[in-house]
């Protein structure tokens, strides 16, 4: 998951993209601190980090090597310096004649703010010390205020407008520079800068209102429900937390084996809340008003140049996918209902609270998949070594563990990796915050700390990212052992990290993962395909004690088990995406959000709507992925096509790996996604191609079926 998504809209001017080429800093630059005893890199993750003498005696470098951030007060220093430099760059932008230099100055302005904002955005939720979190939060507010001022600075806007209005000048620019200029203009216009003063003020007010409503709605999506104990049967009360005479229902309890527990949790947790309903309605109407006001109708799915391009194309994609899934989904529901009848004959109707539980029961019964059987073969160090082997053979990239300086990391468990290309040298740094700790966010995610870009002196600003997971700690007797799901998540997040390392653009505004949302998940989902291929897994999955390799049959069964009821799960995602599109379509909405939910569920899912529930009020993705929830399905379709066309025959094919880097990773967000996809696949895929790619992934592997039936 890309947590940068929220920042991308809160700090619109703090764009996305980075720069070109790095000359020969390879071995020598990181040899100083790379420990040769940590070769292969996996060894660094299979032992607890030990303190070094320079941890105690050496100078304090500050978080991520930023000298000011050795203390929380350093955020104030960093933001003040950024704001001073911002004022100087604004003057430069306004006094420079229109040309390519205009875009470079805008990008430096974006970088100046993002280097504080992006770092603070991570620290405010990822740092274990409250003082650092609070200082980072204040820095986010300060930079956010400046961004809003810049987005409504008429003189700054006009300096960019002069460039875009000059057709001859624009035609003389390269495609990446033109796209970055257009993206900066989009950021201005979504703030209403091109409107008269009264409308511009309304646009600013609407932006503020949308931010406030988004925050309130997001909080409401997780708000627990308290009910009096006597309202639930006594024999299921122990499944819920107690608060005096009340029970606390804080989720759907989707994996509970008792049908009544799941039913009660579903009906109570999703019971309509009038305040939350009003908040959602105001959020949707405010977004529509803003889109009308600034001239982006309907509510924009993000900056221009997505894969889908239009809401009509998105709905066409979802409708065709739903049609192709229909029969498979019906069979999945029949299979789940059969299992429910077998286990609970008195109450056998399949309901919306049933699929997660019964699909798991069927999966376990059919394939005997017990995650604990896999864990001894999947030590964290082995998985990291597997990634290292894969990146080296595909892309010529090696990961080196470095010893961080005192104060550089926020927790002793954080590992620092230098990413080095065999001929281009040092590409950037990945900080691996992989282990559980108190008050750490539970979501696995990727943060951009510093985007790459080509600087004025010709050197390259190296990208820096953080990967955050929640893995168990190693014990005295064994290293950190991963379940198959944890291993797949690790590969997924490393896909984002390598996109950041190899998306080496000229402009920070479009560096690495700073690209349209419906393309951003392609590199990470593609890595999931590698993690499920035995030829890749066999390179590293060995028992941490005996060295015995993970049997091929176990990998095959695991992969096939993921296809159990997968059509029904994909159909659910289609329903969510369609609901999101309708909510952000034509306004005013013809019916209430709950009536729309009921109709959309009937059309796009297949299980009945439950009266007196309002699932949409718990749909947190309506905030960060408003009108963009389809993106995950679209990205998965592209990743599936790339896998089948380019890597299925040989997952270590270096020529295919180099083409993947050249055609897809290297451009970040500096090139339209469809052009990147076309370059990679050597064809322009249609909506039908995307749909077929997703549906074909659901087909069973008959070799595994035959093997298991013997």
Curated annotation (Swiss-Prot):
GO cellular component terms, A-Z: mitochondrial matrix; mitochondrion
Transit peptide: 1-33
SUPFAM superfamilies (alphabetical): Metalloproteases ('zincins'), catalytic domain
Cofactors demanded by this protein: Zn(2+)
One of the GO biological process terms: protein processing involved in protein targeting to mitochondrion
Entry keywords, A to Z: Acetylation, Calcium, Cobalt, Hydrolase, Iron, Magnesium, Manganese, Metal-binding, Metalloprotease, Mitochondrion, Protease, Transit peptide, Zinc
Active site: 493
Notes on how activity is controlled: Activity is divalent cation-dependent. It is stimulated by manganese, magnesium or calcium ions and reversibly inhibited by zinc, cobalt and iron.
Presence of the UniProt keyword Ribosomal protein in the record: no
Localization of this protein: Mitochondrion matrix
EC number(s) per entry: 3.4.24.59
Record GO terms (molecular function): endopeptidase activity; metal ion binding; metalloendopeptidase activity
Modified residues (N6-acetyllysine): 124
PROSITE patterns, sorted: ZINC_PROTEASE
Domain of life of the native organism: Eukaryota
Function according to Swiss-Prot or TrEMBL: Cleaves proteins, imported into the mitochondrion, to their mature size.
Family note: Belongs to the peptidase M3 family.
Assembly behavior: Monomer.
Name this protein carries in UniProt: Mitochondrial intermediate peptidase
């Amino acid at each position: 998951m890309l947590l940068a998504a929220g920042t991308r809209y809160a700090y619109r001017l703090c764009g996305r993209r980075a720069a070109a080429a790095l000359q020969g800093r390879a071995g020598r630059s990181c040899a100083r601190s790379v420990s040769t005893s940590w070769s292969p890199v996996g060894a660094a993750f299979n032992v607890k980090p030990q303190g070094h003498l320079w941890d105690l005696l050496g100078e304090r470098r500050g978080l991520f090597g930023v000298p000011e951030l050795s203390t929380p007060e350093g955020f104030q220093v960093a933001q003040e310096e950024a704001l001073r430099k911002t004022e100087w760059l604004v003057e430069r932008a306004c006094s420079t004649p229109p040309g390519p230099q205009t875009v470079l100055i805008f990008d430096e302005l974006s970088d100046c703010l993002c280097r504080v904002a992006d770092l603070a955005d991570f620290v405010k939720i990822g740092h274990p010390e409250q003082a650092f979190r609070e200082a980072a939060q204040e820095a986010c507010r300060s930079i956010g205020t400046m961004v809003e001022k810049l987005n409504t600075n008429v003189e700054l806007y006009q300096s960019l407008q002069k460039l875009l209005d000059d057709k001859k000048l624009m035609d003389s620019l390269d495609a990446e520079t033109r796209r970055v200029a257009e993206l900066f203009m989009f950021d201005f216009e979504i703030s209403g800068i091109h409107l008269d003063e009264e409308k511009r003020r309304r646009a600013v007010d609407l932006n503020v209102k949308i931010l406030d409503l988004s925050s309130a709605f997001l909080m409401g999506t997780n708000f627990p429900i308290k009910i009096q104990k006597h309202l639930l049967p006594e024999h299921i009360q122990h499944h819920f937390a107690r608060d005096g005479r009340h029970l606390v229902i804080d989720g759907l309890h989707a994996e509970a084996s008792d049908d009544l527990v799941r039913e009660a949790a579903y009906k109570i947790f999703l019971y309509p809340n009038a305040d939350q309903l009003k908040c959602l309605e105001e959020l949707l109407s405010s977004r529509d008003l803003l889109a009308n006001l600034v001239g982006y109708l309907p509510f924009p799915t993000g900056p221009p140049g997505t894969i889908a391009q239009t809401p009509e194309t998105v709905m066409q994609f979802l409708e065709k996918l739903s049609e192709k899934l229909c029969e498979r989904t019906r069979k999945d529901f029949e299979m789940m209902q059969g299992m429910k009848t077998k286990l609970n004959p008195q109450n056998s109707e399949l309901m919306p609270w049933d699929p997660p539980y019964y699909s798991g029961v069927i999966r376990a019964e059919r394939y005997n998949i017990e995650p604990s059987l896999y864990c001894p073969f999947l030590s964290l160090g082995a998985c990291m070594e597997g990634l290292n082997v894969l990146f080296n053979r595909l892309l010529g990239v090696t990961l080196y563990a470095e010893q961080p300086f005192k104060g550089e990391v926020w927790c002793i468990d954080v590992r620092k990796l230098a990413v080095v290309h065999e001929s281009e040298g040092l590409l950037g740094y990945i900080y691996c915050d992989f282990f559980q700790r108190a008050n750490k966010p539970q979501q696995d995610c990727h943060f951009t700390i510093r985007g790459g870009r080509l600087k004025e002196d010709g050197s390259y600003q190296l990208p820096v990212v953080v990967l955050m997971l929640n893995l168990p700690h190693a014990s005295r007797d064994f290293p950190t052992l991963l379940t198959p799901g944890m291993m797949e998540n690790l590969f997924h997040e490393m896909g984002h990290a390598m996109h950041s390392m190899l998306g080496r653009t000229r402009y920070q505004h479009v560096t690495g993962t700073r690209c349209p949302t419906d393309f951003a998940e392609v590199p990470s989902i593609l890595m999931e395909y590698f993690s499920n291929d035995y030829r890749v897994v066999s390179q590293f999955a060995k028992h941490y004690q005996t060295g015995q390799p993970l049997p091929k049959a176990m990998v095959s069964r695991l992969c096939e088990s993921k296809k159990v009821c997968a059509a029904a799960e994909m159909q659910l995602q289609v329903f969510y995406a369609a609901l999101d599109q309708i909510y952000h379509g034509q306004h005013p909405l013809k019916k209430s959000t709950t009536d729309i939910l009921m109709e959309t569920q009937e059309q796009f899912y297949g299980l009945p709507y439950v009266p007196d529930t309002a699932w949409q009020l718990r749909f947190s993705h309506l905030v960060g992925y408003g009108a963009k929830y389809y993106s995950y399905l679209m990205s998965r379709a592209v990743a599936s096509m790339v896998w089948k066309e380019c890597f299925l025959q040989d997952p270590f094919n270096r020529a295919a790996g180099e083409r993947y880097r050249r055609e897809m990773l290297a451009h970040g967000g500096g090139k339209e996604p469809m052009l990147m996809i076309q370059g990679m696949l050597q064809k322009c895929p249609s909506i039908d191609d995307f749909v077929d790619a997703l549906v074909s992934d659901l087909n069973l592997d008959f070799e595994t079926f035959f093997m298991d039936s013997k």
